[in-house]
Amino acid sequence: MNNPTLFSPKSPHFFQPLLPGFKSHINIPVKFFSKYIKGKHEGKTVKLRSDSSKRTWKVKIEGHTLTDGWKEFVEAHDLRISDFVIFKHKGDMFFDVTALGSSCWESSRKEKEIEENIETEPDQFSSDLTCFSQSVTTSNLMRDSVGVPRDFAKRYGFNIGRHEIVLMNEEGKPWESEVISYKSGKVIVAGGWKSLCTESKLEVGDSCTFKLLHNAKMPVFRLCSKLPKAGAEARPLKRARVQRWSQESRSKHDVREKIAEEGEPSRRNRTSNKSTGDQGKLQQTQSCFIFDHVAKSLPRNFVRSDGLIKGSNKIVLMNEGARTWTLILKFRDSRRSFYSRGGWRSFCRENGLKPGDSVTFKLESSNTKTPLLLFSIAESKSASTKDRTRFLTLTVTPSSIRSSRLYLSKKFISVNKMERAGGKKITLLDKNGEEWPVTLLMDKRYTRMVLGSGLREFCNAIGVKAYESVVLELVWEETTTLPMFKFCSKIKT
């Protein structure tokens, strides 16, 4: 990049698009004003300075609005409607102001220089190193964040730390955002993504291309093209990704076809083939582990019936788009269960899985060194509604900790047929699999079930405090035994 300090940590700042009526006054965002100005300065004026002039402008501030003197600053810099202005607070009511055109190039640049740097042919985006493309998915809309290619991030210094940026649509409307990098090497744009998609009418399945405008003092990712999901020609990125994933899974696909045509002679697979389909399917409801843990527990009977414990330390998950994820298969002694690690979170995000969803896998091939499990969206969603009734969210209050009492919903008790468990000791499992006995009582005044003696100790064990919510999963296969709840996650409210 031309400016190596472009992505360095920024001073407190805010940005404003110039709307009709901007010449007489401009507002400082309330949040910024409250945090950096209110109560900290007695002065009634601010000082503005721009890169295009050595002069300093004094502007009156009334509340959080700049008034007298602002018009002179506007006229001196020839600011116009739809231009974009960044205010960087340097302290003591002093601001460095960067005036940008509607395209976010510095307005002080010569028109000829701008024309020489703007790409006009959409075909150039694929080879332009200042561009990157991404697809709109259910999961990235839900998280209000979208990934940034690693090579792009590394090229422009986004692969280290956090960097404040601006997301901008094709019409020049801006949203404040930031680029965040993680130790794993993953880089995302966090914030503003959902709003940009809504404003630009981008839907799930669409692809879009962003161009980095690195002539501005604050990095700008501007939307420069949209590829609708309809039509095969409009999805070159999707095709390329499927082809890349298919290369990894093609050998597994060939093995599946061979098994279907010839049958598998091995004893282990003849045993698994006797099942009617349920034996070859793995269904798990893991709302607590989708985002809070990377591990994914696997039922022991499934793992044993399909022979996955013999010599296999890896499994491969494949979705309906032929993309694969390789996970490490391990055994947890404390819970006496198998689990997988290494790609579960990525798998959930890519396939739009949310807390409370059920996940159904079908064993496609177990005769290879690395077993292959096929994920079905349709089957997973059909099972999701039923299994969500097994999850219970409880909010802990100071009184519930003090009295060691926490009420359960009547609907949850009724749906799961727990009425006869009142007055008995049930078991709560913490995140390490340790058992905590807790009394389940019936409060006759409110005709409701309540967790009693032992609750306080369990809350201390899982580290939940007052005003936090805890998600529990009912682990109860038959009504002849006492109910058991497994701790999933805690939610700060």
Swiss-Prot record:
Concerning InterPro entries, the annotation shows:
B3_DNA-bd, DNA-bd_pseudobarrel_sf, REM_fam
Question: Which SMART domains does the record match to this protein?
Answer: B3 (SM01019)
Database matches in Gene3D superfamilies = DNA-binding pseudobarrel domain (2.40.330.10)
Q: Where does this protein chiefly localize? A: nucleus
Here the segments flagged for biased composition (Polar residues) are 272-281
Q: Which residues does UniProt assign to DNA binding?
A: 11-103, 131-226, 281-378, 391-490
UniProt xrefs under Pfam families: B3 (PF02362)
List the PROSITE patterns.
B3
One Gene Ontology term of the molecular function aspect: DNA binding
- Name by which UniProt lists this protein: B3 domain-containing protein REM6
- Species name: Arabidopsis thaliana (Mouse-ear cress)
